[in-house]
């Protein structure tokens, strides 16, 4: 129903599978605990030319355009930027629930925690969920109850791989002497950063915290033999908060030393 789907936000636009825990029988209380974890990786990277091949092809382009060749003095790296930004990600999902029932009352309480570490370094996502439902049987044919689903989500500060497949391999990742990430050569540094600047130094520059809650209260009345009347009041609440800042970044330029 919409109140259960609401906590998934846009992720639930194409539908979700909701697993309903079996309710306890009258006089029973059930406790269910389950957890899972896994790993994820990028199985196939985009094949890129190495530094020597890049220098040859770039200078060939300049010659064909009638321009002088680029002086690669000081640019001695041979970096595969995809190797630098990617990592093996980690996923875990954990849930605990308690359900119980008597002749006049049934309840369900569940909580969950999900955490995902992305395939790009410093990319992570987490979600805490809470589900509560209660139903009271006032008479043999009249029941009242409520349901609530809530979630606190810390979305990932997502990064793209575009820079990693565009950046020249001739730049080294880091200059140990000055303790700085290396900038890209003149023909690229105005267009993009060293990919690790975006992945590492700009990590967590966007901080978001989202809350979602939905619920309903209802009353059900069975009358005659095959008829039921149900009245329901529903609510849906969402709060999305985000902050972004631009850090001051220093980088090392191999072509401007001294």
Regions found by a protein language model. Give the residues of each.
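Outer-membrane beta-barrel channels and translocator barrels
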Residues: 26, 91, 102-103, 139, ...
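Short, surface-exposed loop/turn motifs at beta-strand boundaries within globular domains
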Residues: 12, 89-91, 127, 210-212
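An active-site-proximal structural segment forming one wall of the substrate-binding cleft
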Residues: 219, 227
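Surface-exposed loop/interface segments of Gram-negative outer-membrane beta-barrel transport/assembly proteins
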Residues: 25-78, 118-123, 129, 133-214, ...
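Periplasmic N-terminal accessory/gating domains of Gram-negative outer-membrane beta-barrel systems
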Residues: 1-5, 15, 39, 78-89
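A beta-strand signature from Gram-negative outer-membrane beta-barrel systems
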Residues: 1-32, 91-93, 106, 112-117
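Outer-membrane beta-barrel initiation region
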Residues: 45-47, 84-88, 98-102
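Membrane-embedded beta-strands of outer-membrane beta-barrel proteins
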Residues: 17, 96, 130-132, 215-217
